[in-house]
Amino acid sequence: MSADSSANLPATLKSLPADMELVLKVIPMPADCNANGDIFGGWVMAQCDLAGSVIPARYAKGRMATVAVNEFIFKQPVRLGDILSFYSKLVRIGRTSVTVTVEVFAERFRAQGEYIKVTEATFTYVAIDDDGRPRPIEKT
């Protein structure tokens, strides 16, 4: 392999983020594949939304809704058999909203113990009342 082609390979990591919380771990199944045989991006987005909601739920202490996908980047394809680890970190707490980042790492089926960042995203969630209207988040 030439030096030029190795520059296009994703960087493999031996460890996962220490400054973020593991909020979800999942293995995609064959039903989650797209027409190319990779995992469908919409499935990855849905899992990121679920993972992203874990930290805001602690602050909302009640109903909440996703109000924005501020950023979403697919860095590498997710493959059948990958073990996906979703890490999240608090970015900001507003009056009614919580913003978090989510980073997704794949442990490839044939490369156990090595991780590749496949997705990164930023989500904003808003605390809502029983009528679906924004409500203040209690500061603790």
For each feature predicted by the language model, list its residue ranges.
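Small beta-barrel nucleic-acid-binding modules, principally OB-folds
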Residues: 61-77
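A positional/architectural concept
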Residues: 24-26, 30
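A conserved, well-ordered hydrophobic junction motif at loop->secondary-structure transitions
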Residues: 31-46
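Active-site helix/loop of acyl-thioester processing domains in fatty-acid/polyketide metabolism
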Residues: 42-62
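Short histidine-centered beta-strand/loop micro-motifs
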Residues: 35-38, 57, 76-77, 113-115, ...
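HotDog/MaoC-like acyl-thioester-processing domains
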Residues: 3-6, 12-14, 18-24, 79-83, ...
